Amino acid sequence: IHYAVIDQLTDQPVGSLALMRIDAKNGVVEVGHVHFSPLLSRTAMATEAHSLLMHYVFDTLGYRRYEWKCNSLNEPSRRAALRLGFQYEGRFRQALVIKGHNRDTDWFSIIDSEWPQIHRAMRQWLAADNFSADGQQLRTLESFR
């Protein structure tokens, strides 16, 4: 299920992300196909988009586990997962063949017992008083956890 991220100031799409590998019986879902334009990447709006989707998964759907998987060589994706509160679970070596080459996949997750603390930290980080007049964060997201 793909979701568009819409900039509320311009009413224009600036990115998308998807819920994949949906396992309702076990309450497990993966976030993936995250595509953010330069207007969205590395912004408070990007963090808010992830926070809103996590809130939907945990608090509306009642799921137990939220997964993030990425190419082990994709350092920006790995950093984003960790920054958002995902726990690194391990590397699945040679998990895929992409364009004729082996690809290792790193797995990350947030589970329902971790979600309240992560959600609280995201709300505190996203609060207007955590940003200067020019939009710079005063404290990191990690510092709220």
Language-model-detected regions and their locations in the chain:
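Acyl-donor (CoA/ACP) binding surface of acyl/acetyltransferases
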Residues: 9-145
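A short helix-loop-beta-strand connector motif used in the catalytic cores of GNAT acetyltransferases and
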Residues: 1-4
